[in-house]
């Protein structure tokens, strides 16, 4: 494949097969046999619009499956439509393409994957799952829609139980078929109940009724898989569970909640460019915690899986950049399981258009290359398991710069540099106003002036070695220089490979209208807890 070699070498180390089946222990997904944590770092592969996973007319199946593994993903969220099993069970891949006048896609499939043409759509899905499994990639089967179509809108007839195309009985039938079908396929490690419940028919009592029915049905037919449950309002709202938990007793340690987030969620796109980014990030992460993050704690604690987030990877958009930098920071702090939308680089058919590009896709439109290597690098820390509650290793800090995806490393010249996050430098920090020390040593980070590199020093007693969060910021680590000026850690790869200190870009008040031409994300550094080897 034509992936950039450096990226391949970084990510291939975690592409090995994971142990299945999986289970849960409080907020963590674990190996059912050993009890050790298994972090899911996944890509979405759309298969519901044309009832076949995308891209099989562009590259051989094994090439695509291997590509997901080489990009570092240990699982794929593979979407499907229930009609594929309840209305089109005997339809072959070739017939499906012919019915949709997908002449060009059929020609490409004949070239790259002729072995799939005579298979039913369901058997072709199984072939895709087997190919992923052969490369150590687990599968989450996601029930995206009933009638095959692009998802989602409030009035598409696919949004909630009882909608035009969303028959609860047909839905339960499909869940039963899929659960039974993959009972003996260990790399299918999870099934979702339904993607992004939404629309005018939304009703909490109906949600409880069918979520309980669907979850119990899947677990009865296939007790090996995790069962993913989505909330209301496009899978962002679970607040109603605070006072009325699901009566599932965690489904024998198989219950997982899922949530989604984009820059445009709840009409917030313009806020990412027109509002103070520090203010916006603080309030959005608080909103996520309020609506879904609380599920990770308490007596009914369960894993929270971010099964969709993503940005346009084909252009430099300020709103998307600010959003994803904020979200990655929050995800790293909490070491969440996640799935990027999207893995796929194109579609057979979408909204009446043949072979459109997926600009959010990790693959490009040729399915040969990584679309955006810089964004791929941004994922290097969150691809890793950072926190293992069952680890015996001592906790340390990783210094994470979410804008670039790099980590703060101790350079041989006794300065702080930005480098890779694999086997990165370990730091220790005791909290507000204390030094940031190179773990296991007496050396610490010292600021020496505006625009100058941060030094590693033996003098850890003065203000220039005392670090705390800047006012009204969650992520800007600051101290004072000898003149009493507040300086923040700052990294801009276009300026220097070293981490500098520069004047802090912060508001005097927690003000949503505080906007400057220079944005603060280059100064965002997190000290993330880790106990990984």
Predicted regions and their residues:
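Aromatic-rich peripheral "rim/lid" segments of glycoside hydrolase catalytic domains that contact
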Residues: 316-404, 514-520, 524-533
